[in-house]
Amino acid sequence: MPLRPGRCYRHFGTPPYTRLEYIKSNPPVLIPKFDLGNPKGNFNTVLKLVVMRPGQIRANALEAARQHANKYLTAKVGEANFFLRVAVFPHHILRENKMMAMAGADRLQDGMRLSFGTPVGRAARVEAGQIVMLVKVDAKNIDHAKEALRRAASKIPLPSRIIVEQAQ
């Protein structure tokens, strides 16, 4: 089955579902690398992608944002001239009570009886003001880093903004 739209999982009203010892089918984490670029570089500017509202960000949205920002920064700045970090981890397991949509489906399924759902993916729960992505660059590459984070923000289902700070 295809993925549901991101708006189905954007908000949360239930406790986090994270206890992996009780979950039979554990969905994989889709993000292979959380740190990209040059982690040992001495950069003087830090740019942060901060979410404005609380919500959930699915792992595939985080991965899409990471790939988009990394590809842009690698092409424009170079692999050794930036450090990119995905600052949140998708701990929360998403569940879905799969329903059939065809003629005669009411005889085949139980509706809301035993509707706990099966695991379909992962999401990171974030609060308002929390950092989602972090980019460290030199002062001459600030514009490229801003553009990379702007493109990454378009992949995230929550409103966000970019904060520029001097590194310490």
Swiss-Prot record:
Q: Does Oxidoreductase count among this protein's keywords? A: no
A Gene Ontology biological process in which this protein takes part is: translation
Q: Which CDD domains match?
A: Ribosomal_L16_L10e (cd01433)
Among the GO molecular function terms of this UniProt record, one is: structural constituent of ribosome
User: What PROSITE patterns is this protein classified in?
Assistant: RIBOSOMAL_L10E
Q: Which GO terms describe its cellular component?
A: ribonucleoprotein complex; ribosome
- According to its UniProt record, what is one Pfam family this protein matches? Ribosomal_L16
**Keyword Iron-sulfur among UniProt keywords:** no
Which SUPFAM superfamilies does the UniProt entry name for this protein?
A: Ribosomal protein L16p/L10e
**Which protein family is it in?**
Belongs to the universal ribosomal protein uL16 family.
Query: Under what name is this protein listed?
Result: Large ribosomal subunit protein uL16
What gene makes this protein?
rpl10e
